[in-house]
């Protein structure tokens, strides 16, 4: 039969035994928690790894959603854009032209004085008073004109039609038979028609244009410009 002293020492032993059991239980729980955490980590890692290739596989397997009408509509869209661009440029040009003031120059002819005949841009006067070439030029200058000159076929034909049967002094002259013909303002004659003879002064005769001596008296023809320009905006 155990002694009372032995019975009194039992509780400490029991207490120690319980303490060891608790430590073992705690160690088992810690080990279990560690294994659980490791398993969870590996499971999560594996799940993540398995998701990555799966998502890539899904991306590779996803069909491209493109409308079959898109390629056909692209040229049409480009055409519309080009037409609109051209229209915008044309409208811009039209507006700029519209804003720019337009000045129109119109060439008109004034009425010739009384007894003068207008042809083209000149007025002609047939002086029926015979005189030499030099004095005939003086008479023309008194009327702010010169002995007649012609620069076009129209003017030439007019003079031929209206001269009648008489000879008329005109504005051609030269220094000698070897020199070129000039008008009274010393501008060169364009040789529209040849001038016959070897004299220094020209006149209009029945045979066309000829040269004669300046002191011989003849009728004369005067001419002066009648053109002016006016600007209308």
Swiss-Prot record:
Where does the UniProt annotation locate this protein? Cell membrane
> Would you indicate the residue range of the signal peptide?
none
Q: Which InterPro entries match?
A: C-type_lectin-like, C-type_lectin-like/link_sf, C-type_lectin/matrix_domain, CTDL_fold, NKR-like_CTLD
Q: What is the lineage of its organism?
A: Eukaryota, Metazoa, Chordata, Craniata, Vertebrata
Which residues lie within the region annotated Disordered? 1-34
Q: This protein is called what?
A: C-type lectin domain family 2 member D2
Its chief place of residence is membrane
Residue numbers on the Extracellular membrane side = 98-233
- A Pfam match: Lectin_C
Q: What is the documented function of this protein?
A: Lectin-type cell surface receptor.
How does the UniProt record describe the way this protein sits in the membrane?
Single-pass type II membrane protein
Q: Gene Ontology cellular component?
A: external side of plasma membrane
Q: Which UniProt keywords apply?
A: Cell membrane, Glycoprotein, Lectin, Membrane, Receptor, Signal-anchor, Transmembrane, Transmembrane helix
Domain C-type lectin, chain residue ranges per copy: 119-228
